[in-house]
């Protein structure tokens, strides 16, 4: 049986996922802060800002977490490891974004991967509409 993972990115086209009805055996992976209505099995985080936001807003999702070393340091700093279920810790890789980490992990686990909201792969769009409303970007 083919295993399917849906990686929900942050780009504008992520809304196309709203038309998909996930099957019980599909893995849903969200990147960073997940907007309401998306219920991921796994949340992938590689930066410190989403962890700080969760801490500051008392938001502790019940999904498993795949995190980078940088995010793990932030989880320890905020003493969140008793509230966040970390399932996988990745080495920090320069120029990788959260979506790349998540897709790579799914492929390494043998999943057929469907990507939603990965606009920057196919265009010059670097927008992350949902994330940008929550965490201001200082470099764009």
Mark where each language-model region is.
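Metal-ion/cofactor- or nucleotide/acyl-coenzyme-handling active-site neighborhoods
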Residues: 1-140
């Amino acid at each position: 049986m083919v295993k399917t993972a849906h990686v929900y990115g942050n780009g504008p086209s992520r809304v196309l996922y709203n038309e998909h009805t996930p099957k019980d055996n599909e893995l849903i992976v969200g990147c960073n802060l997940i907007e309401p209505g998306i219920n991921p099995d796994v949340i992938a985080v590689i930066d410190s800002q989403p962890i700080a936001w969760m801490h500051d807003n008392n938001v502790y999702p019940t999904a498993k977490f795949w995190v980078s070393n940088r995010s793990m340091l932030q989880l320890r700093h905020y003493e969140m490891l008793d509230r966040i279920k970390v399932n996988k810790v990745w080495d920090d890789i320069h120029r990788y974004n959260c979506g790349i980490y998540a897709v790579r992990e799914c492929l390494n686990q043998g999943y057929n991967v469907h990507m939603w909201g990965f606009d920057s792969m196919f265009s010059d769009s670097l927008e992350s509409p949902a994330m940008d409303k929550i965490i201001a970007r200082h470099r764009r």
